[in-house]
């Protein structure tokens, strides 16, 4: 009997902040299970979830507007601790009898708050002290409105000159509100505050650990599929790889992995996938060489969106054909992760923040009535990686830079040809190899090479050549929503350029992309 790792759980109500998923990830990092729901849930749903505590997230709207989001009143009647963050604090204050109004001074960025009263939330936590010994906390503010009167049964815990109620608390009811973001790293003691709330005030045990998550997932897979056979599309990416390892641990040879080599992978990637999962880990893998099929389907197509659709359609066709060859397969496994599951459909009113959903459910043939197995659907990407390490997958593979689903199909600009893919693979491998050698790979968030369908004149020896151009791209980002181009050293870029031009026959010029996001996107297509 595996331990119930969902026994203690935190409910996070999403009011639309860009940081809400980060709040959930922080709670998980503390070893406690949590779920992220739209703010307009019902009392029955909250009762059914039975949380140990509730966090109200930040949000972009103003509580002073008539139809702005409100927490369900039951949140304050459930008898569990509640922690309001920014907008969450404001709606808590307003709903419990306080007052909120637009501030003359909008606070965005670093601030220092002074702790003026004792509270379980921040007791013993400080970044500095005032001259008279009061604790100071370095925090990250992001708000236009502010609480101007707290509910009558609350006390002021901390303040700034422009924000008189930076932290408020009702210790008896265990209600807390902060007018800053404890989940971001700029709030230096933010994790300690979240830990104080989740572990001490809500009294949640740290049951959510990689080893226990694996045990739980294996038990659930076995309970769901029994002795049935399962099929999985293995791409070599993080999600499908960890899904494969979990299923292999749970059901062994009853798992068949279909690896479709579409000709759009990185250099030697197909061989690496087959060697690792087939030879090293002993998984049952069906290898489908399908380069010609994909490239012929892409012939003549220049539009990026059309290319994506063609690659997706052909993959489904190839996967379906292989699935039909297998006998008695009852289940399809997928590497769906928690951010894929979070979507606006959870909102009954339609006012909750829309987080785009991209379920990766492939179109299976109608005659194949399969159940769906999604062992990662409760997990964030960082948790998937930690589980992968626990399962024995190599660090370099799990922490590789993101690679688009359509692969080189969207890194070859315009029409995709085998010649272009082969040149790009070799150029990109040199760039990545040099980044690793220079200890720069882990210092950038994503790096890759793009093939440009233009020829440029070059000089080789005494002759001139007229060959292709590639662009190097490297960015630094926290969330991939915005990104800065990486300021790689000039001598490093020169070394990469020289190697590519000298070693990859067919490329005469290398350029470096210095566009940020926005206005550019990270990928070129």
Swiss-Prot record:
Pathway entry: Purine metabolism; GMP biosynthesis; GMP from XMP (L-Gln route): step 1/1
Molecular function GO labels: ATP binding; GMP synthase activity
Keyword Ligase applies: yes
SUPFAM superfamilies: Adenine nucleotide alpha hydrolases-like, Class I glutamine amidotransferase-like, GMP synthetase C-terminal dimerisation domain
CC per GO annotation: cytosol
Active-site residue numbers: 86, 181, 183
One family name in Pfam for this protein: GATase
EC number of this enzyme: 6.3.5.2
Binding-site list for ATP: 235-241
Entry superkingdom: Bacteria
Keywords: ATP-binding, Glutamine amidotransferase, GMP biosynthesis, Ligase, Nucleotide-binding, Purine biosynthesis
PANTHER family: GMP SYNTHASE [GLUTAMINE-HYDROLYZING] (PTHR11922:SF2), GMP SYNTHASE-RELATED (PTHR11922)
Oligomer status and interactors: Homodimer.
UniProt cross-references to NCBIfam families, sorted A to Z: guaA_Cterm (TIGR00884), guaA_Nterm (TIGR00888), PRK00074.1 (NF000848)
Protein name: GMP synthase [glutamine-hydrolyzing]
Gene: guaA
